[in-house]
Amino acid sequence: MERGPVVGAGRGAGARIRALLGGLVRVLLWVASALLYFGSEQAARLLGSPCLRRLYHAWLAAVVIFGPLLQFHVNPRTIFASHGNFFNIKFVNSAWGWTCTFLGGFVLLVVFLATRRVAVTARHLSRLVVGAAVWRGAGRAFLLIEDLTGSCFEPLPQGLLLHELPDRRSCLAAGHQWRGYTVSSHTFLLTFCCLLMAEEAAVFAKYLAHGLPAGAPLRLVFLLNVLLLGLWNFLLLCTVIYFHQYTHKVVGAAVGTFAWYLTYGSWYHQPWSPGSPGHGLFPRPHSIHKHN
């Protein structure tokens, strides 16, 4: 007979704890939603500013040109100075894969939610196919430059012995070293990805301004792209500080910028191209007035 009140009190306490935890979860979800909304709005406003995008180009140029000077003021034994560090292996070496995955999801959601048309969505996604072709083509061109400008050397205790082997493949097969002009493919790829992601993400400001559907999944994907863009900037700075020769880095960044200009700055504005980011997604002002 005495157990009844005890059991009832235990059940009441458990119910109060569950209610308290449920309320706490709802508060945390509300805070997370508010932060997601606020963060995506502010990031979209920053990336959508034409003035800030021009300053961003100047920032990338300053990083590549003046960043190597920081090597005299940083610890050469830091983890980022090692070719085998986690970020270099997992992110830099697969930079295009990360960029294509994150940015592909963002472009897919933005274009399809704005137009509901598969053909238009596929056209905008084809910019990533062009980007992959640019990446592969540039990599092959860099190897060709290294082959044409290089010579074969055998490392000896006294120094290097020059060999007459005609090409890189036969030189490496013989266990020797091939030394030529090596354009920094990492600097090229990170520069190209930074410019490409900034250009694509800038569309989100106009997307929000037109009142198009922007739920939590889309905002989260957008912020993930912003975080990846920030990571690419940081890893580009680490690359120019710790790795490669100065001219190799500058040439790599220059080629990446030129590739961006040929595509986003020129070709994508033509009617026979994949189209520039945001092209055909939003109604023009005069068409809105005519409809009204």
Swiss-Prot record:
Entry's Gene Ontology cellular component terms: endoplasmic reticulum membrane
Endoplasmic reticulum among keywords: yes
Species per Swiss-Prot/TrEMBL record: Bos taurus
Family designation: Belongs to the FIT family. FIT1 subfamily.
Residues annotated as catalytic: 186, 244
Membrane topology: Multi-pass membrane protein
Subcellular localization: Endoplasmic reticulum membrane
Covalent S-S links between cysteines: none
GO biological process, one term: phospholipid biosynthetic process
General function of this protein: Plays an important role in the formation of lipid droplets (LDs) which are storage organelles at the center of lipid and energy homeostasis. Directly binds to diacylglycerol (DAGs) and triacylglycerol.
Transmembrane residue ranges: 19-39, 55-75, 95-115, 142-162, 188-208, 221-241, 250-270
Official protein name in the record: Fat storage-inducing transmembrane protein 1
Keywords, comma-separated and alphabetical: Endoplasmic reticulum, Lipid metabolism, Membrane, Transmembrane, Transmembrane helix
Domain of life: Eukaryota
InterPro entries: FIT, FIT1, FITM1/2
Residues in compartment: Lumenal: 1-18, 76-94, 163-187, 242-249
GO terms assigned for molecular function: coenzyme A diphosphatase activity; diacylglycerol binding; triglyceride binding
Residue ranges, Cytoplasmic side: 40-54, 116-141, 209-220, 271-292
Important for catalytic activity (site feature) positions: 248
